[in-house]
């Protein structure tokens, strides 16, 4: 078996690494560089350029040079972030037939995984040239806060590039592997990985422990923003230059695609220079021309000015850090080391902000551009069986569940659960003789299902006629090691089952994810009220069902007055159930239970008489029912409602 290579598929730059024995090796590409720009150019003659060669010709071919394709991967065209990018990118972002965001190049529509596959192909070739043998297997990294659709799309990109993707691994986790593997410290260490790359931001809290000579990397929590990175910092510089030039020369460069491409290059260069010097000159001769002749651009940019332009972007990274610390159940003082990953963390202001939040100097012994690829290569060695002393325990970033009676979100797997994981719960039907149930799968933190993101739905049909609550429908959630979700439903009585894998075209935007979490906090009280109303309603409906059934079976044992009293209480409760008044529902439920007490006594008396008649048999029956009760412990008192198809 050949080597499993590690690839960091970045928004701005990509990197490939391998393991040589116990040593990691970042491989130089054909131009001799250890990182490759994630830029793809489509030439007029059909040739495709990738990396530095694509970057060099971007100024003369802006409409057919694609960069930051990772920002579009697994996303819908209508998403706010995609719409924002449409106005900024020189190339055309278009809507695909399935609603996804694709790119149009030379009259041809291309999916982001197709474009990213070109970068992966270059990484594959880089490794093959170095090893002198074909490479077919890889571990590819993604931002920890990537959702199901984005992970699936990244896997698809690998397949398009001719790679069998053995594992999708989270970038901060990979960086922790690279950092922690050669550390000889005994005892547990908690580290924070702050990963600010070209297009995405992640933070993970990871515990590194020595367990019987094995290094265990356990992710305690993760958070982030998949639409925040170096590209946004560059854009602030570009906007500033455009504004200054307009003031000086009266010319607006924002509509000139050739000028924009030169500005992008200059902005990135200035940003990098200002990490080491206090000011830089942005000098672009012949940037444009008007009736009076050619115009030259010459602007001084100081580090202080840059910091003021991007202050809010840096500040945006702190809230996810705070949430990650809280979700991990620790305090900032418990963090032993802070690791910086991603090129943007070279910016002094970013380092200063991180130091201010975590109260300690970030480590400088990790290469922010290479650590992620190195970690992916280590994981590749673990998967190939060549390394036995590493155990990696990652997590899922958001809660997953299904909609149950009353529109409640019944969470099956909560956020920050270690993966791979599998969880099953038994539900039942909401109506008598219900032939099918619709399983709706949601992702998010809200208590009411409709406030979360619908990932997919499917039917389980052919349920034999039975009274409500009798059929046993087992719903299974299974998240694999790549963080991809599979859901199944099985009728325990008939053995019939149905399964769904959440597909890439049902992606979740980072904005939606953040909105869900924020909404969950803001609307916690509102959700609580709705939840209490649903619970009261479910209780009331169950009471109506039970009493009505008992009345039909044992009503003849009551005198007419008692029976009428119960029937009236049932009517009152049924009327209350149609309202939104929880207090009224509770009151009428209590009234019905009180009114039906006599009926209960009659039923209890009959049962006692029957018991006395066969005392010996009763003991055996009791032991049998105890066993049955134990078996039913995993049955949850929640119900799935059938969605009637018109």
From Swiss-Prot:
<feature type="compositionally biased region" description="Low complexity">
    <location>
        <begin position="607"/>
        <end position="631"/>
    </location>
</feature>
<dbReference type="InterPro" id="IPR012725">
    <property type="entry name" value="Chaperone_DnaK"/>
</dbReference>
<dbReference type="GO" id="GO:0005524">
    <property type="term" value="F:ATP binding"/>
</dbReference>
<dbReference type="GO" id="GO:0051082">
    <property type="term" value="F:unfolded protein binding"/>
</dbReference>
<comment type="function">
    <text>Acts as a chaperone.</text>
</comment>
<feature type="modified residue" description="Phosphothreonine; by autocatalysis">
    <location>
        <position position="200"/>
    </location>
</feature>
<dbReference type="InterPro" id="IPR029048">
    <property type="entry name" value="HSP70_C_sf"/>
</dbReference>
<dbReference type="Pfam" id="PF00012">
    <property type="entry name" value="HSP70"/>
</dbReference>
<comment type="similarity">
    <text>Belongs to the heat shock protein 70 family.</text>
</comment>
<keyword id="KW-0547">Nucleotide-binding</keyword>
<keyword id="KW-0597">Phosphoprotein</keyword>
<keyword id="KW-0346">Stress response</keyword>
<feature type="region of interest" description="Disordered">
    <location>
        <begin position="606"/>
        <end position="646"/>
    </location>
</feature>
<dbReference type="InterPro" id="IPR018181">
    <property type="entry name" value="Heat_shock_70_CS"/>
</dbReference>
<keyword id="KW-0143">Chaperone</keyword>
<protein>
    <recommendedName>
        <fullName>Chaperone protein DnaK</fullName>
    </recommendedName>
</protein>
<dbReference type="GO" id="GO:0140662">
    <property type="term" value="F:ATP-dependent protein folding chaperone"/>
</dbReference>
<dbReference type="InterPro" id="IPR013126">
    <property type="entry name" value="Hsp_70_fam"/>
</dbReference>
<keyword id="KW-0067">ATP-binding</keyword>
<dbReference type="InterPro" id="IPR029047">
    <property type="entry name" value="HSP70_peptide-bd_sf"/>
</dbReference>
<dbReference type="InterPro" id="IPR043129">
    <property type="entry name" value="ATPase_NBD"/>
</dbReference>
